[in-house]
UniProtKB/Swiss-Prot annotation:
Signal peptide: none annotated. The keyword Secreted does not apply. One of the primary rRNA binding proteins, this protein initially binds near the 5'-end of the 23S rRNA. It is important during the early stages of 50S assembly. It makes multiple contacts with different domains of the 23S rRNA in the assembled 50S subunit and ribosome. Forms part of the polypeptide exit tunnel. The keyword Glycoprotein does not apply. It comes from Wolinella succinogenes (strain ATCC 29543 / DSM 1740 / CCUG 13145 / JCM 31913 / LMG 7466 / NCTC 11488 / FDC 602W). Pfam families: Ribosomal_L4. GO terms for molecular function: rRNA binding; structural constituent of ribosome. InterPro entries: Ribosomal_uL4, Ribosomal_uL4-like, Ribosomal_uL4_dom_sf. Belongs to the universal ribosomal protein uL4 family. The gene is rplD. This is Large ribosomal subunit protein uL4.
């Protein structure tokens, strides 16, 4: 059974909580589809080559059809000419987005969390709030955890807490709206607030 580690306010181990058995039935393909869709949405789609209809010039036939001994040509915009259009080149009007429905997104997140739990890298804490807003306090929290590359997930975005975590290189603070399967998979460990963890693991 996959279990998340419960932490107290000092981020010391204080017990375990089991993930629902239904998480075991989720197929890894849901995570694959979501990550593929997420990365596709980040593509800049800036590669562009002009086709023969977009190259300037070419209104005049470059030489006579017959009598010159050269191959016939109708326009200097032809791909066979230097400076002509490009055949089958990249076009910036392509849409790389891949559709993933809400159910698949949810299953992908649940599967990613289950994987972290099986690795012993999923932690549940009552609150991640840093009232001081100071980076040193957020760093102390991270150092106590003794993990590399950690995703902290809070239920509600708090400005002071965000500022406290913002400058830490190996940490990232996400709220409930930002949390997704890609973020969970990208970090080595995940610390999530109890209220949000319960929302994700409940039925329905």
């Amino acid at each position: 059974m996959s279990k998340a580690i419960i932490l107290n306010n000092e981020l010391q181990k204080n017990g375990e909580v089991a993930l629902p058995e239904r998480f075991k039935e989720i197929h890894s393909h849901n995570l694959y589809l979501y990550v593929k869709s997420y990365l596709a949405s980040l593509r800049a789609n800036s590669a562009k080559a002009k086709k023969r209809g977009e190259v300037s010039g070419g209104g005049k036939k470059p030489w006579s059809q017959k009598g010159g001994g050269r191959a016939r040509a109708g326009s200097i915009t032809s791909p066979v000419f230097v400076g002509g259009g490009v055949s089958h080149g990249p076009s910036n009007n392509r849409n790389y987005d891949l559709k993933v429905n809400k159910k698949q997104k949810k299953l992908a997140l649940q599967y990613a969390l289950m994987e972290k739990a099986e690795q012993g890298k999923l932690y549940v804490v009552d609150s991640l709030q840093v009232d001081s807003g100071k980076t040193k306090d957020a760093y102390a929290m991270f150092k106590t955890l003794n993990e590399r590359s950690t995703l902290f997930v809070s239920q509600i975005s708090d400005e002071k807490t965000f500022l406290a975590f913002r400058n830490l290189k190996e940490c990232y603070l996400a709220d409930a709206n930002e949390l997704n399967a890609y973020l969970v998979a990208a970090f080595r460990s995940v610390v999530i607030e109890k209220s949000l963890f319960e929302n994700i693991t409940k039925e329905g």
